[in-house]
Curated annotation (Swiss-Prot):
Record protein name field: Astacin-like metalloendopeptidase
PROSITE patterns per UniProt: ASTACIN, ZINC_PROTEASE
Gene behind the chain: Astl
Stretches with biased composition (Polar residues): 340-355
Biased composition (Low complexity): 318-329
Source species of the chain: Mus musculus
GO molecular function terms listed in the Swiss-Prot or TrEMBL record: aspartic-type peptidase activity; glutamic-type peptidase activity; metalloendopeptidase activity; peptidase activity; zinc ion binding
């Protein structure tokens, strides 16, 4: 077991490099019928179909394992860390750069289709709008995140150094951005809400209903989650039936039996607050164009100063795909979830309420959050340009001859039309230092 545990990081690294070098062409290079297909798990309109399966059930169905002891994962979706890192709380943080932003370089596999890439970018946009976290194009940085459609939904906790893998299989994206947000919170250094040290005041773990051998996934731990009060509505909370043996609840809320746990829709207020506290995001962190967010200290939702660049680009993509999609395709009608609909954090559960119906309602269109129409100010933005601009797909380190050329995402952003208000698309990506 010890040998296998030490080999898993190397195995994941090799699989990641293989996926990057053998990735399929992007959707923009497909002809005709490619743009008319609808990925499994989505409606023709592009809205995600709600599934009963959460992260543990998805991984149990995709990853063959007998017990957690034989797995490279702990708590269902966390890559097993080395023993000394288990004792660490804050030394695996991502560093803060110039301007008060925390930049996390990322690389996206070519195997994702356009709709899946849009879901991932939507999750990036939520962090950009509410925190000082910025996911930027990989351009030779030493530490970066490689996002791949491997078997399951999993990631490591915090910055591990070098390339670290985040797996988001197609099944993980069927509900929309929720599972992506969950795994990215792990990347930022956060563990599961139901495993925090004070959880017994808020939930009861039904040990008799846990799948035999999987009890280890419910061990309490000291973690960065303790920066805020316990939150039933956290995107880091597992649902009632996690690792259930006979279909009975394994996690039972104590304060109210009807509260919804395990939501996979938005970052909750406490999720945003804990990110801002761990990374010391200032009250107002403007970017190079004077935009940013304001963190309110009274526990209420964070109020963005303006719509982020990524949100504007997502709007433009939605508008563009709606007008240029081939006949019969309805992917252009996808409803992109509005950001900022996070549920209220539970400062004290008895006095707080949580609307289950809020999760069942369709997400608010981004157009409703902006006075300008979708795609305004981006007349020359083509669907192909945007798909190239969404994410870098090939590490420059693998192709030395490309070192003097701009990264695909950078080159595409530079060819985009200016956004309203003189905001240059992808400006924070162009600021990433080159080797």
């Amino acid at each position: 077991m010890g040998i296998m545990g030490s080999l898993w990081p190397w195995i994941l690294t090799m699989l990641s490099l293989l996926g990057l070098s053998m990735g399929a062409p992007s959707a923009s290079r497909c002809s005709g019928v490619c743009s008319t297909s609808v990925p499994e798990g989505f409606t023709p309109e592009g809205s995600p179909v709600f599934q009963d399966k959460d992260i543990p059930a998805i991984n149990q169905g995709l990853i063959s394992e007998e017990t957690p002891e034989s797995s490279f994962l702990v708590e269902g979706d966390i890559i097993r860390p080395s023993p000394f890192r288990l004792l660490s709380v804050t030394n695996n943080k991502w560093p803060k750069g110039v301007g008060g932003f925390v930049e996390i370089p990322f690389l996206l596999s070519r195997k994702y289709d356009e709709l899946s890439r849009r879901v991932i970018m939507d999750a990036f946009a939520e962090f950009e709008r509410f925190t000082c976290i910025r996911f930027v194009a990989y351009h030779g940085q030493r530490d970066f995140v490689s996002i791949l459609p491997m078997a399951g939904c999993f990631s490591g906790v915090g910055r591990s150094g070098g390339m670290q893998v985040v797996s988001l299989a197609p099944t993980c994206l069927r509900k929309g951005r929720g599972i992506v947000l969950h795994e990215l919170m792990h990347v930022l250094g956060f563990w599961h809400e139901h495993s925090r040290a004070d959880r017994d005041r808020y939930i009861q773990v039904n040990w008799n209903e846990i799948l035999p051998g999987f009890e280890i996934n419910f061990i309490k731990s000291r973690s960065t989650n303790m920066l805020v009060p316990y939150d039933y509505s956290s995107v880091m909370h597992y649902g009632r039936f996690a690792f259930s043996w006979r279909g009975q609840p394994t996690i039972i809320p104590l304060w109210t039996s009807s509260v919804h746990i395990g939501q996979r829709w938005n970052l909750s207020t406490s999720d945003i607050t804990r990110v801002c506290r761990l990374y010391n995001c200032s009250r107002s962190v403007p970017d190079s164009h004077g935009r940013g967010f304001e963190a309110q200290s009274d526990g209420s939702s964070l109020t963005p100063a303006s719509i982020s660049r990524l949100q504007r680009l997502l709007e433009a993509l939605s508008e563009e795909s709606g007008s240029s999609a081939p006949s019969g395709s309805r992917t252009g009608g996808q409803s992109i979830a509005g950001l900022g609909n996070s549920q209220q954090g539970w400062e004290h559960p008895p006095q707080s309420t949580f609307s289950v119906g809020a999760l069942a309602r369709p997400p608010q269109m981004l157009a409703d959050a902006s006075k300008s129409g979708p795609g305004a100010g981006a007349d020359s933005l083509s669907l192909e340009q945007f798909q190239l601009a969404q994410a870098p797909t090939v590490p420059l380190a693998l192709f030395p001859e490309a070192r003097d050329k701009p990264a695909p995402i950078q080159d595409a952003f530079e060819r985009l039309a200016p956004l309203p208000g003189g905001c240059a698309p992808g400006s924070h990506i162009r600021e990433v230092p080159r080797d």
